[in-house]
Amino acid sequence: FDPADLDYFVLNHMEPDHTGAIKTLLRVAPKATILCTAKAVPFLKEYYGVTERIKEVEDGETLKIGKKTLQFFHTPFVHWPETMMTYDVEDKVLFSCDAFGGYGALRGYSFDDECTDLDYYKRESLRYYSNIVAKFSRPVLNAIAKLGGIDVKVIAPSHGLLWRDHPEDIIALYTKWAEYATGETETGVTLLYGS
């Protein structure tokens, strides 16, 4: 395809690992408009000097693109304040940004049903959660509650495996981990020793 034919760039999140190529993309796609939350607009200006060709999308707003409908869900502080998720209504794919993500080299496959060591990726998802998302456990639970009414067949995070065979598994894991950080805790002591 010719990038000049692109109409939109969806920015679910403004961290540079998600947006570092935006100026180049705008140059090669001169008709394209950026779709993002209102909170992302100042980031675009400060990080990249981009102040034009931006459309702020509202929480729950839909956009018909050909035979596809995109729906945008604001999920603030599921890592950063401007974060949103995008839902492909027809294919039931949730582009979840940093939520439901994981670490781990993909070893030649992208989907949960293709991999031979799913437990490894679940552990890598826990490592990712604890390092990237855990501080934002309450917003994670809020996002899960907000999205509870949509029919998700595939979860496509920005990092890690795409979950198409059992998307409910990664949702359940993230729910459990978020509840660890926000619910009742066990009293305990950790002893660290090094020599």
Residue ranges of model-derived segments:
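Short, hinge-like loop/turn segments at secondary-structure boundaries
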Residues: 51-55, 113, 174
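Terminal amphipathic helices with adjacent charged low-complexity linkers/tails
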Residues: 154-186
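Metallo-beta-lactamase
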Residues: 31, 35-157, 162-165
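Glycine-rich phosphate/diphosphate-binding loops that line cofactor/substrate pockets in enzymes
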Residues: 1-4, 146-151, 180-186
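Active-site neighborhood of phospho(di)ester-bond hydrolases with catalytic His/Asp-centered motifs
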Residues: 6-14, 35-37, 94-97, 155-159
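Active-site metal-binding motif and surrounding structural segment of the metallo-beta-lactamase
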Residues: 1-34
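Redox- and metal-dependent alpha/beta enzyme cores, enriched for Fe-S-associated oxidoreductases
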Residues: 193-195
